């Protein structure tokens, strides 16, 4: 079931959240689906609900990372599905009034997954990053946060 507002208030009174980071979508993506409007609407509802439950907490929606598949004997970004889903997530974040972080671009954009696999930072399914890749992305994420905080004078 959904998180009730009452339960969220109880939880927040015990351990208040400074930030909530959401990351969804990798397994939703398929090469055949290029329209993620219903996904974006549902994600907007989820984020708005969290905003209601935790009104003083910053919320960041991490976009989907790169995902590759084999085409003509070589692994390549699952075009244009990755970009379509990432844009749907960006729209959902904008609509819900939260920050969007572009994981796909942070991974290097088109064919970024190839670099992750080559460096042992993603599984050979060319879909899922591993702990080493997560550490690399986390470093980029923190750099982005620090940059924005400095830019905003926080």
Label every model-predicted segment.
Residues 43-48, 86, 90:
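Generic structural signal for well-ordered alpha-helices
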Residues 66-154:
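Catalytic His-Asp segment of secreted/periplasmic serine-dependent ester chemistry enzymes
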